[in-house]
């Protein structure tokens, strides 16, 4: 097995130790971004749209440095990185309403022809040098507004790493990460089945919880961790008692739901297989005359390593839309928790861990019965 290109911290006191990201954290992020954009997307596919309601892949290569440069320019009062016309085409992507694609918020103009890859990479290089210069001058830590812009840029790039990865999963041409060997999915499935436990309901008591950040978002400070608009203001809310499952809905549980209800559509993360165990490219399902076992054998799950037979992914959390997951949760006797309910679950689990370090409940709860 090859070691990952970098190791990202999992605890807040580690990955958010200071309100301003370190230059080392930037280098780690840039190496990961470069791996995904330059080694997992073939150059000839940069103009492709794996998700039709999104921009082409090349947009994101220009959007990340351009949007960040705009925020640094606002924060520092400096000059834009050239070419400045990138601001016109890379500031904001398209994000139409899924149910009515005609409803689209304002977005950057889409050019008849995107800039060349070399132009975009040169702009990215200049932007990264601008970031390095800010740290070298001490401005990153001495100027509060600049520090906030740096954190905004870090989170924005991380979020779009996720955007690109779920876009690549919808493509037929994505390349696997070059720094990791393909997992033995059959062995992983066997181990998961051997160690499987029942997905129990847990009682979560009523409690009052805090939601949101105390972040005034002003250049005068005080120095606090950056928060997006939806994370503010801080407030308290009372959450009623409920029962919650101990882990996410799995592919196996979702397969039972689809088979039992005769749903005609599969989640976008699945693929049907043809008789020769190949992908047939049709996102539909029929279960007339099929056994549940045959239904499962005829499906695959999209991964960055290519399709993996569903029978090897039954214990994975299912990736599906809210409506799809909520339908399954209702079939299982519950529903999807609200934001406040999910936060209440996390609060309760954290309290249990502090009282009983040896006892661990699931981190993510898929269904609520209350």
List each language-model region with its residue ranges.
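N-terminal regions that are enriched for targeting/export leaders
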Residues: 2-46, 50-53, 135
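Acidic/His metal-coordination segments adjacent to aromatic residues that form catalytic metal sites
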Residues: 104-117, 141-142, 310
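Short, well-ordered surface patches within globular domains
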Residues: 151, 161, 167-177, 251-252, ...
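Flexible inter-domain linker/hinge segments
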Residues: 172-209, 215, 220
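Short, contiguous alpha-helical
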Residues: 2-3, 24, 43-102, 137-192, ...
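Core domains of carbohydrate- and sulfate-ester-processing enzymes
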Residues: 82-103, 198, 205-207, 266-278, ...
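Short aromatic-cysteine micro-motif
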Residues: 116-128, 227-253, 261, 297-353
